[in-house]
Structure formats: C-alpha cells, structure tokens
Amino acid sequence: MSGRSVPHAHPATAEYEFANPSRLGEQRFGEGLLPEEILTPTLYHGYYVRPRAAPAGEGSRAGASELRLSEGKFQAFLDVSHFTPDEVTVRTVDNLLEVSARHPQRLDRHGFVSREFCRTYVLPADVDPWRVRAALSHDGILNLEAPRGGRHLDTEVNEVYISLLPAPPDPEEEEEAAIVEP
C-alpha cells in the first residue's frame, strides 16, 4: 500500500500541465450549456473540471487565444467573433500589447447579453511595440503579429537627482535666539 500514490499535481508546480499554457480555451462565458456538455463525463484535474470533449459546431473556439513565439516573429491569435471590427481596440503601452472589446446589451438566442473583455500580452524584450500589426479574418480571428529584432531593445533609465532639503529649525533654538537678541 505504501508504494501506491495518487497522481496529482498542485497548480503551482512545474509538473502541472496547465502551468504555462500556450493556448487558452473554453472562454464561452454566459452562453449556456449544450446538451452534449451536460451528458458528457468530465475529467478531473485536481482543481479544474472540464468537459471530456469540446462541443462540436459553431462557437467551439469562441474566446480562444493562442500565442506563438518563433525566432523571427511574435504572433498571437484571439477569437473576437462576438464583436464587430469597430468594437475591438488594439494598442501597445510600453512592452504590453492590449486587446479590448466591448459591445452594449443586445438580444441573442438565450436572451440579452453584453460582453466586454481585455487581454494583455507581454511582448518579448526584442519586439518593437511600434511594429505590431493586427489583421481580422472573416471568421473573427484577430491575428496580432510583430517581427522579433534578434537584439534586445535598449530601455531608457531616467535617474532622478535627489536634492537635500534643509532641516526645519528647532523651536527651542529659536526661543534661545530670541532671548539673546534684545
């Protein structure tokens, strides 16, 4: 009995299979369950219960995100099919690439829904944020791409001078000086 162990990995360990995913899926928030999701047995991964099979048909990739890093370029793919092109915003702030989208409440097959999300990617040190390009495919997949420079971009360090302020006068010394002066 002592030689047996239950296979289990804590999410904070390197052995945990979802510790550093390159793909994020199952982000269909607020869309309801399909019949095959209810009746399908689940897999238990310690802390996360998920359907055994991904639902088939349209919408199975809704919200999916994939990140690819190669020697030549940085690439991220993000499913934004629930949004129109004018509802999606892409911007860079320093070495961060931010994708956000928002649409007001509207009617869908389950009732009324409003959606909003913001995903931020950290760009590798050798990617120039000014060279990021975005393209949206006909099926709602946003392709974010930037060439990797092969060299780390210099970071600007601004060293701020610290000036020393004079100490405030001591109240006792002021009283003594006032007594001596008359």
Curated annotation (Swiss-Prot):
Expressed preferentially in skeletal muscle and heart but not in the lens. The keyword tRNA processing does not apply. GO terms for molecular function: enzyme activator activity; structural constituent of eye lens; unfolded protein binding. Residues 55-163 form the sHSP domain. It comes from the Eukaryota. It holds the Pfam family HSP20. GO terms for biological process: negative regulation of apoptotic process; protein refolding; response to heat; response to unfolded protein; somatic muscle development. The keyword Glycoprotein does not apply. It is found in: Cytoplasm; Nucleus. InterPro entries: A-crystallin/Hsp20_dom (IPR002068), Alpha-crystallin/sHSP_animal (IPR001436), Alpha-crystallin_N (IPR003090), HSP20-like_chaperone (IPR008978). Interacts with DMPK; may enhance its kinase activity. Belongs to the small heat shock protein (HSP20) family. PANTHER family: HEAT SHOCK PROTEIN BETA-2 (PTHR45640:SF27), HEAT SHOCK PROTEIN HSP-12.2-RELATED (PTHR45640). May regulate the kinase DMPK. This is Heat shock protein beta-2. It comes from Homo sapiens (Human). The lineage of its organism: Eukaryota, Metazoa, Chordata, Craniata, Vertebrata.
